[in-house]
Swiss-Prot record:
Keywords: Cell inner membrane, Cell membrane, Membrane, Peptide transport, Protein transport, Transmembrane, Transmembrane helix, Transport. Residues 101-290 form the ABC transmembrane type-1 domain. The complex is composed of two ATP-binding proteins (OppD and OppF), two transmembrane proteins (OppB and OppC) and a solute-binding protein (OppA). It comes from Salmonella typhimurium (strain LT2 / SGSC1412 / ATCC 700720). One of its GO terms (cellular component) is plasma membrane. It is found in: Cell inner membrane. Belongs to the binding-protein-dependent transport system permease family. OppBC subfamily. The lineage of its organism: Bacteria, Pseudomonadati, Pseudomonadota, Gammaproteobacteria, Enterobacterales. The chain crosses the membrane at residues 40-62, 103-125, 138-160, 164-183, 214-236, 268-290. Induction: Part of the opp operon, which is constitutively expressed. This is Oligopeptide transport system permease protein OppC. PROSITE patterns: ABC_TM1 (PS50928). It holds the Pfam family OppC_N. GO terms for biological process: protein transport.
Amino acid sequence: MMLSKKNSETLENFSEKLEVEGRSLWQDARRRFMHNRAAVASLIVLFLIALFVTVAPMLSQFTYFDTDWGMMSSAPDMASGHYFGTDSSGRDLLVRVAIGGRISLMVGIAAALVAVIVGTLYGSLSGYLGGKIDSVMMRLLEILNSFPFMFFVILLVTFFGQNILLIFVAIGMVSWLDMARIVRGQTLSLKRKEFIEAAQVGGVSTASIVIRHIVPNVLGVVVVYASLLVPSMILFESFLSFLGLGTQEPLSSWGALLSDGANSMEVSPWLLLFPAGFLVVTLFCFNFIGDGLRDALDPKDR
C-alpha cells in the first residue's frame, strides 16, 4: 500500500513536470517559423533594407534631385559623401537606390494586398456558391488570364503616358488571378466540412459564412502565396522599368536604375552593381520567408 502511494505521488510529480501548455495554430506556426534560421535571417535582412530605403534619404546630405557637377560618374568615395558613387548627371546613387527601393517595395506589397483582398474574396465566393455561378466566374478568370498582359501595358502607356499609378493598375490586374484559383480550390474542400453545414442549417447568410468561416480557414495558404507573390511582382515591375514601360524619370525604381546602369556598365559598373545587389538580396529574402511560412503553416507538416 505504501509502495503504491509512493508510486502514485511520483507519477503525479512527473506528470506536472511534463505538463505542456497548449498552443493555438498560429502560435505553433510562429514557433516553427522562428526555428527556421534562413527565414528569420531573411526577415532581419529585409527589415534592414526597409529601414535603409526609409531613413537613408533623410540622413543623406544630398537630395534626390541634387547634381554634383564636379563628381559626374564618380566611383564610390567616402570623402566626398557619395558612398555609392554618382551617375552620369552627378546625382547621388545611394539616395536614388533608396528612393527606387521604396517604389519597388511599394509595388510588390501593393500587388500582394490586391491579390489577398480581391483574389481571396473572388475565389471563396466562387468556390462556395458553386454551380453555374462558379462556372461563369472561372470562365471570366480564364479570359483575364489569357489576355496578353504586355500588350495591355503598352496600350496603357500609349494612351495615358508613364506614371506610377498605371504600374499599380497594370500589376494589380494580374496579381489576384492565381490567388483566386488557389482559394477556390481550398473553399471547395472546406464547404463540405461539418462547421460550414452547421452554419448553413443555422440560417447564417452566405456573406457571413464566407467572411467568418471560410476566409479565416484559408489564411494560411493566402499568407504563404502572398509572401511568394511579392518578389514576383517586384521582379515584374523591374522588368517593365528595364524595358522602359515602367517607372521613369523623375521617379525611379530598381528596374529603371538597372536599365541606366546596364548602358554604362563598362565605364561605371557601380551604377549596375548596387541596385542589382539590393534587388537580388530582397528577392532572396522574400523567397526564404515564403518558404519558412509554407513550412510553418503547411498542415501536412504538422
